[in-house]
């Protein structure tokens, strides 16, 4: 296919603005799949995505299109996630495209992720095509949407295409706008082969399937290719394009988006953002890859059975292949054995990884309480970064501590502004800006600690605003804080896997919450169990699980009181001895309960 007839674009938008539904309509219109095989959210091929109704992985697909003037085009497009935790997926999709469809819900208008995704596209010089979706809804307000496109986004509202992805309205006009307004890939002056790896997945029979965008040269079956980051060489066994399923081709030429398989079994050889070149005529310089993503939430993960450690490691490596933003390193715990310390982009990312490990890889795992990465200055003047309670130094060695702060942008209907301001203030937020976008919508900007957003902020924000508020954030640096380590003790023994780092002002509530949760989860034993929350040697919270006891007086009908007292004393001695040797068994549900946040007020 000539370069001038190829169009590469992605669909970006806020959560629930209809990206996957629009992708469904484009695919149906192109007739690349039989109606019998078609299902909604066709590109969302994970069970989690379908159940939650969200997109987690960007998915590429190639569709043919014959324009009104009779010219045939090849359209490569990527359906992207909308949630703030998966912005990295969006940025990778954007790097392999020349244009972006910016989708706006006609009933909701411009929201926080709409803005941040547009700025991402502008950073990469993409042609932005605004699309107003859901025009069939009774609540659709098209004039207001056009006003927001002009004033909030700075785009020409007359360029906006009106569609209803659900009903299929306006899809023909959208196709024509794509071929007319999104530019074709630029021809390269360099004759050497250069292809950017923007994703991968693991096939148990064929090894690693590498997703690429070819910028110059071509990739063919039988060609020997080289990865420029580590000089590993492989021979291509198969190349092709994505038409929902993999469709083999003879070659991938410049401008194309597709895949290649080269019998790669060493998962660590592949790095998303790397450049693939030809081993015979290698390129001198690699393509600009992706910005290294920095995890913001950390949690340790352990197998339920310590014998499954090697299986868990293999699963983590295969998962990292398909999710480049996941980071992990070896970790160990006295209570839980060997495991991994993992970095995530947010709490939803953590939940998704946990579900994928359990469903896709059949792993039973325990996650510890999530934490952020703190900066600690020791009395010796040395600065260290700590994201795990196990690494936390003695309080006497700490001169000062700092925690990461975020700039949070919240767009909400004016009706709910009061309760949202109260929530942000409770979460130690400082308001930096507030502006009315129109008579009904307000944007408020807060600077607040990232650790406060981890627990129940997002749920409560949605609850207070009846689901209408939208939230986006950027990490802006570190600020001073008062940090303490909360230890959880069971009958005087510290359980390292339940320890947490917390702001001093929240420590009492956090410790009490964990103790209450554990009391509900730990089954009664034959001896009393004391559950305590402590900072250093000071106990700040306590709950008690009462013992089960046998009625030793059941056989005594009347008789001397000293006989009864003797039996009770004997039972008491036995309980004391049992407590000395008895270990408290913690069920997996106890670890999961600690992760649960307090219900929104």
Language model features with spans:
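Structural and coupling elements of P-loop NTPases
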Residues: 1-601
């Amino acid at each position: 296919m000539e370069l001038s007839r190829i169009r590469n674009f992605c669909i970006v938008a806020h959560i629930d603005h209809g990206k996957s539904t629009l992708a469904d309509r484009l695919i149906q219109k192109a007739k690349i799949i039989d109606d019998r095989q078609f299902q909604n959210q066709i590109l969302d091929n994970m069970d989690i995505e379908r159940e939650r109704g969200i997109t987690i992985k960007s998915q590429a697909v190639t569709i043919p299109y014959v324009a009104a003037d009779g010219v045939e085009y090849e359209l490569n497009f990527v359906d992207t996630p909308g949630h703030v935790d998966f912005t990295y997926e969006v940025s990778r999709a954007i790097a392999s495209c020349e244009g972006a469809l910016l989708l706006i819900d006609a009933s909701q208008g411009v929201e926080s992720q709409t803005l941040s995704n547009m700025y991402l596209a502008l950073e990469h010089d993409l042609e932005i095509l605004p699309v107003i979706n859901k025009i069939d809804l009774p609540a659709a307000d098209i004039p207001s949407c056009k006003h927001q496109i002009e004033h909030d986004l700075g785009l020409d509202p007359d360029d906006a295409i009106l569609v209803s992805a659900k009903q299929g309205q306006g899809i023909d006009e959208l196709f024509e706008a794509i071929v007319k307004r999104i530019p074709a890939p630029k021809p390269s002056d360099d004759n050497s082969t250069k292809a950017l790896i923007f994703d991968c997945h693991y096939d148990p029979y064929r090894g690693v399937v590498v997703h690429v965008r070819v910028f110059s040269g071509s990739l063919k079956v039988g060609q020997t290719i080289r990865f420029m980051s580590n000089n590993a060489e492989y021979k291509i066994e198969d190349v092709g394009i994505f038409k929902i399923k993999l469709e083999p081709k003879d070659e991938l030429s410049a401008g194309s988006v597709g895949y290649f398989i080269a019998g790669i079994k060493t998962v660590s050889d592949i790095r998303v953002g790397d450049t693939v070149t030809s081993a015979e005529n290698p390129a001198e310089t690699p393509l600009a890859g992706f910005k290294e993503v920095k995890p913001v939430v950390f949690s340790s993960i352990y197998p339920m059975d310590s014998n499954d450690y090697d299986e868990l490691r293999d699963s983590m490596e295969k998962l990292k292949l398909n999710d480049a933003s996941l980071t992990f390193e070896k970790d160990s715990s006295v209570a839980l054995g060997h495991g991994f310390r993992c970095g995530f982009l947010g709490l939803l990312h953590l939940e998704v990884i946990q579900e994928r490990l359990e469903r896709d890889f059949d792993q039973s795992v325990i996650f510890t309480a999530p934490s952020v990465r703190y900066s600690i200055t020791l009395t010796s003047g040395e600065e260290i970064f700590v994201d795990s309670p196990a690494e936390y130094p003695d309080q006497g060695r700490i001169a000062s501590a700092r925690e990461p702060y975020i700039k949070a942008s919240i767009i909400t209907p004016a009706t709910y502004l009061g309760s949202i301001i109260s929530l942000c203030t409770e979460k130690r937020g400082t308001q930096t800006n507030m502006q009315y976008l129109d008579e009904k919508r307000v944007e408020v900007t807060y600077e607040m600690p990232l650790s406060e957003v981890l627990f129940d902020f997002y749920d409560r924000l949605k609850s207070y605003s009846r689901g209408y508020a939208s939230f986006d954030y950027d990490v802006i640096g570190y600020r001073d804080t008062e940090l303490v380590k909360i230890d959880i003790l069971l009958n005087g023994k510290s359980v390292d896997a339940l320890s947490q780092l917390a702001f001093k002002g929240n420590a009492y509530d956090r410790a009490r919450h964990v103790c209450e949760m554990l009391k509900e989860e730990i089954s009664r034993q034959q001896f009393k169990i004391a559950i305590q929350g402590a900072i250093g040697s000071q106990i700040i919270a306590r709950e008690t699980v009462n013992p089960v006891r046998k009625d030793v007086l059941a056989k005594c009908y009347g008789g001397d009181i000293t006989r009864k007292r003797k039996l009770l004393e004997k039972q008491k001695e036995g309980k004391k001895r049992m407590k000395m040797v008895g270990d408290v068994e913690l069920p997996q549900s106890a670890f999961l309960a600690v992760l649960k946040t307090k219900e929104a007020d």
